[in-house]
């Protein structure tokens, strides 16, 4: 299956599951392919045939954007370099959770979260340690007795009861011994943080030299500006004074070319899904106020405005207001 067909299939699956899905980010660079929202759940999704194609820089940017937009970065893919992804298993690449299409279908359509995650050494599960301790004590078993049943040390059993994760083989043994499961579902929409190796997210990249002027003006207008390296937009502006009703911004900046117009359309679609406003700053007068929901503001207009509040008002007047979840 081609990557384009895979993206189409995943998009259709998300729509069937009740997600509002953005237009595909059919431009380069792009750290994700689509954004999708269902209620309060927002996903920034990268769709790959081979998940090992996700590089460190893209993974880091997806995690940064997830933090700025209150979203879950997620990869859906078919295989690694060596094998197909297994169903009901969460993998990780550069700190980003990775699911197979079948696992994504179970999670988003059927409402069945995965139980297993891949880590160095094999496949593991979360163990409900409190339940395990209760069941062991109800049987009147000592730590040593259960350790003997499992073929592990007494100290290891104690760690399971304290919340240490277990191999899938141990989880199966526990279920056979007590005739009930002890595995806890993974919170994929929370980034599966309970099992993900903590990988520090790098700082924001420096803005392009051509964008520094725009960054300075937005900062003066009350936004914390986070430049991007591979996103479909140049920066995310976090509103430091949301009382004025602007909220966060997706921003672009360039001459108003055919490519810029396409990028502004995509930003409008992303803004609708991520519940942010979008604004594109142009080097020349675009002869219009907006492309779909993305405000167009020329750099000459920016330079002519001294009052930071007026800049916010200009963006608010020309951009589409975000809708509530």
UniProtKB/Swiss-Prot annotation:
One annotated GO molecular function: DNA binding
Name of the protein in its database record: Putative HTH-type transcriptional regulatory protein HQ_3058A
Keyword list, A-Z: DNA-binding, Transcription, Transcription regulation
Annotated spans, Disordered: 189-211
DNA-binding region range list: 143-162
Biased composition (Acidic residues): 200-211
Organism for this UniProt entry: Haloquadratum walsbyi (strain DSM 16790 / HBSQ001)
Segments forming domain HTH cro/C1-type: 132-186
Hydrolase listed as a keyword: no
SMART domains in the record: HTH_XRE (SM00530)
InterPro entries: Arc_TR_HTH, Cro/C1-type_HTH, Lambda_DNA-bd_dom_sf
């Amino acid at each position: 299956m081609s990557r384009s067909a895979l993206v189409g299939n995943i998009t259709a699956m998300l729509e069937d599951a009740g997600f509002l899905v953005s237009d595909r980010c059919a431009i380069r660079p792009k750290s994700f392919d689509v954004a999708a929202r269902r209620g309060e759940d927002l996903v920034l999704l990268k769709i790959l045939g081979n998940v090992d194609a996700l590089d460190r820089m893209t993974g880091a940017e997806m995690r940064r954007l997830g933090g700025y937009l209150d979203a879950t970065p997620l990869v859906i893919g078919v295989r690694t370099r060596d094998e197909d992804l297994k169903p009901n298993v969460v993998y990780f690449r550069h700190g980003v959770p990775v699911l197979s299409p079948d696992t994504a279908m179970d999670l988003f359509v059927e409402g069945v979260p995965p139980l297993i995650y891949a880590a160095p050494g094999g496949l593991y599960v979360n163990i409900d340690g409190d339940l395990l301790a209760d069941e062991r004590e109800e049987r009147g078993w000592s730590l040593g007795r259960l350790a003997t049943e499992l073929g592990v040390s007494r100290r290891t059993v104690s760690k399971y009861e304290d919340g240490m994760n277990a191999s899938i083989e141990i989880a199966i043994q526990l279920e056979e011994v007590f005739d009930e499961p002890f595995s806890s579902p993974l919170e994929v929409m929370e980034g599966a943080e309970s099992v993900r190796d903590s990988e520090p997210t790098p700082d924001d990249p420096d803005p392009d030299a051509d964008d520094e002027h725009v960054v300075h003006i937005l900062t003066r207008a009350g936004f914390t500006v986070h430049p991007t390296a591979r996103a479909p937009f140049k920066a995310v502006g976090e509103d430091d004074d949301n009382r004025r009703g602007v909220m966060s911004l997706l921003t672009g900046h360039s001459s108003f070319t055919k490519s810029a117009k396409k990028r502004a359309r995509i930003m409008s679609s992303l803004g609708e899904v991520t519940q942010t406003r979008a604004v594109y700053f142009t080097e020349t007068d675009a002869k219009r106020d907006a492309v779909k929901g993305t405000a167009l503001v020329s750099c000459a207009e920016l330079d002519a405005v001294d009052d930071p509040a007026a800049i916010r008002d200009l963006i608010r007047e020309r951009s589409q207001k975000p809708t509530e979840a």
